[in-house]
Amino acid sequence: MLRRLPVLQRYLPIYKDVWRLALPVILTNLLTTLVNIVDVLMVGRLGPVEIAAVGMANTVRLVVLVVVLSVTAGSMALAAQAKGARDPERLSFVTRQSLSLTVLIAAVLTLVGWFIAEPVLTFLNSGGDPRAVELGAAYLELLFLGTIFLTLNFVTRSLMQGAGDTVTPLYLSGSVNVLNILFNYLFIFGPGPLPALGVTGAAVGTLLARGIGMVAGFIIFYSGKNVIRLLPGSYLPDWGMFRDILTIGVPSGLQGLVRTTAQLLVIRIVTATSAGTFGAAALAIGLQIESLAFMPGLAINVAATSLVGQSLGRWQPDEARARGNAAIGLGVLVMCAIGAPLIVFAPQLVTLFDPSAQATVVSAGTSYLRVNAVGLAMLAVSMVTNGALRGAGDTRPGLVGNLLGRWLTVVPLAYVLALVLDLGVVGVWLALVAGTAVSGAYVLVRWRSGRWVNVALRGSEVYRRHLQHLTQAQQHAFLTQLRTPLMALPEATEHVEDTGVSYRSDEGEADISFGTSGYRVHRNTTGLELSAS
């Protein structure tokens, strides 16, 4: 049967690899979401002021997560490429430098966060109960003091996932989350001889759990039993590696900032419609429901980063393309399957989150889920393609796609449709789908162009050792020969005009000359090797 379906025969093993990596990530995200829900329920028993305090504090903490993403995205891509290259020394070096960079960033965030916590919460709480600022500031200051625990947990997990181990992060995250729930209960309510610390207890419980998780991560790295083995070496900053991590990671971090700021304007537009506050409530409920629907797409995004990065680490761009294509296709299928029940059961899902069943909230929330369910296919394209490009170290297209989709599409289109054409909240929902389509189309075109291969090579050890001294025209000629066609080196003899590049290939090997410099290229089952001839 498979012989009659060559495409399926080719991609079925890749689909299995994607699911092998993605399923533990889905479970990890579910556990994290469960902990967040339980935290809200626990704090909710203290009263509405306490809920507001924690809610505002967690909004400020999103800034920390955006900064951390600037490290995790770069670390994940470089770890994947080092693992694919079968270079344990480089994988250990990437890990040590990622941890060092994280510690430096955490120190800065701790100092800044400690001083801005109360002023920022005061600004957010304009006209609200002043007790929310007092409680929220105490909670947030403690969290900022423990920034190093939070950030190292994220980076440790991302390094393992990039290197192809998504199971250990599942166990690690699951254990930390269980401890988080236990500690929060103990310190919030103070059973027995323990003091009831209320909102402050929630911060203490979180810090203790994250601290244990950080120590456990280091033990795993040094145990010698994980895919990442920390070999003897220095943790002193290597500014070249810091640059490589941030070159890949900063655009990913800025993507989060673009989404967050655009979302604030979307909320402002929603509240300006006839639905008002009820529309904002519907949007909040819709996003909460969608956060569960997003999990498979986000997990396949992580799998795509790891698989594409590993293929490029051993310089198999043809395999990287096949893996990326398979992940994108699988993401679309899975997200479409999730969209169907969102359309059918939208009213029931909204009512589940709003037991009062307020008519405007249910109506607006139902329309949100149904309109956005139609756009889940393009959302999958955007998510997974971004992950595949990240594996190649090509993260700028994701940032540009988000700018085009969010700021140049969603914000102006939502204003026009909702307020000028008076479509109300439905106009905002349509604008969100249009923005997703724009950003998804942009990154997909970038992926299909194959230019990410150039980015991957320029960030590789092959480039640093052999090609960095060449002119741009010579580099372009060399990259073209390696990229076209991707499946095999062509059998040909060629001289590229105006570059001094001579190219001869025979049965998977090639001699490439740049004036007085010559290189021998050999493609085998493990990848591409380049050496001076």
List the model feature ranges, each with a label.
Residues 25, 29, 40-41, 58, ...:
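Transmembrane alpha-helix boundary and packing residues in multipass membrane permease domains
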Residues 30, 34-52, 121-130, 186-197, ...:
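Helix-terminus/linker motif at the lipid-water interface of multi-pass membrane proteins
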Residues 26, 30, 34, 38, ...:
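Generic alpha-helical transmembrane segments of integral inner-membrane proteins
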Residues 72, 76, 142-161, 169-177, ...:
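Short runs within selected transmembrane alpha-helices of multi-pass transporters and secretion channels
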Residues 20-36, 142, 176, 209-213, ...:
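Transmembrane helical elements of multi-pass membrane transporters/channels
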Residues 51-111, 150-169, 280-346, 379-401:
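Small-residue-rich hydrophobic transmembrane alpha-helices
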